Amino acid sequence: MKFFVYNPLLKTASLNIKVKAAAKSNDIKEFIIINDVLHLKLSIKAHAQQGKANEEIINFLAKEWQLLRSNLEITKGHTNSLKTILIKNIDEEYLNLILKPYIK
C-alpha cells in the first residue's frame, strides 16, 4: 500500500490523515487503514470549531516536519475528521524520511 501519492514533476505529495480534535496533546500516531486507504492518525489539542483544528494541524505538522506553513494545505475534509493534505516543494526522499517513524 502507498502511504502517499507523490508527483515528481510538481514536487508535491498528497497524504490522508485521520484527526482527533480536542485531544490532550498534539501528537502524530501511526498509519491506520480506513476503507482500504492508509491514513496518518493525528491528535490535535484544538477544538474542531471555526477552523481552529485545521489551523493547528498545519502549524503542528509544519513544526514537526520542519516545513513552511505555506507548503501545507488541507485540500479535502475541511469539516471532517478524514482529511487530505497537500505537501508542496518536497523531495520524495525527505517525505519518506519524515514518515518512516509512523510506519509500523
Curated annotation (Swiss-Prot):
InterPro entries: DUF167, YggU-like_sf
Family: Belongs to the UPF0235 family.
Cited Pfam families: DUF167
Protein name: UPF0235 protein A1I_04385
Organism: Rickettsia bellii (strain OSU 85-389)
S-S bonds: none
Domain of life from the UniProt record: Bacteria
